[in-house]
């Protein structure tokens, strides 16, 4: 049923666009004659009826306001879609990179957990013995 409503909406939109084109041609080529005025009034009535039919069509599709703004500015909505998809791809790559770094760092932490003690005390020690040779000891000041 949703497909039928979408098709009906598309057909009605096409008819409305055709009526708008006919109105623009009538306005552009107007001679000011009574016949021309009556034709324009008739097309305007048709346009109003087509807008009413558009309003009556039930369609559960929501159009983002950004897309409507694009159309109002005379831009192609496909450009909006392409730019939106490119932005999502960049964000996805960024998040994927963060996840990869976390996985690698977690692996490094796990592989070095035996080598590095968890409780490392830091501080200044005076007169700490520093060994330069395994058999020789000397006094040094580490700060």
Curated annotation (Swiss-Prot):
GO cellular component: mediator complex
Region (Disordered): 123-143
Localization: Nucleus
Keywords, sorted A to Z: Activator, Nucleus, Transcription, Transcription regulation
A single GO molecular function term of this UniProt record: transcription coregulator activity
Residue ranges with Polar residues bias: 124-143
GO terms of biological process kind: regulation of transcription by RNA polymerase II
Role according to the record: Component of the Mediator complex, a coactivator involved in the regulated transcription of nearly all RNA polymerase II-dependent genes. Mediator functions as a bridge to convey information from gene-specific regulatory proteins to the basal RNA polymerase II transcription machinery. Mediator is recruited to promoters by direct interactions with regulatory proteins and serves as a scaffold for the assembly of a functional preinitiation complex with RNA polymerase II and the general transcription factors.
Family: Belongs to the Mediator complex subunit 10 family.
Complex and partners: Component of the Mediator complex.
Protein known as: Mediator of RNA polymerase II transcription subunit 10
């Amino acid at each position: 049923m949703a497909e039928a409503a979408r098709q009906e909406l598309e057909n009605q939109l096409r008819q409305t666009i055709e009526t708008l084109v006919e109105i623009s041609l009538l306005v552009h080529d107007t001679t000011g004659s009574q016949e021309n005025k009556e034709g324009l009034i008739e097309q305007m009535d048709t346009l109003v009826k087509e807008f009413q039919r558009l309003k009556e069509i039930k369609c559960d599709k929501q159009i983002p306001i950004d897309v409507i703004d694009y159309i109002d500015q005379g831009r192609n909505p496909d450009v909006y879609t392409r730019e939106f998809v490119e932005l999502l791809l960049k964000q996805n790559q960024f998040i994927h990179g963060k996840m990869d770094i976390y996985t690698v760092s977690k692996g490094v932490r796990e592989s070095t957990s035996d080598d590095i003690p968890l409780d490392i005390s830091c501080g200044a020690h005076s007169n700490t013995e520093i060994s330069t040779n395994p058999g020789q000891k000397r006094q040094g000041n580490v700060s």
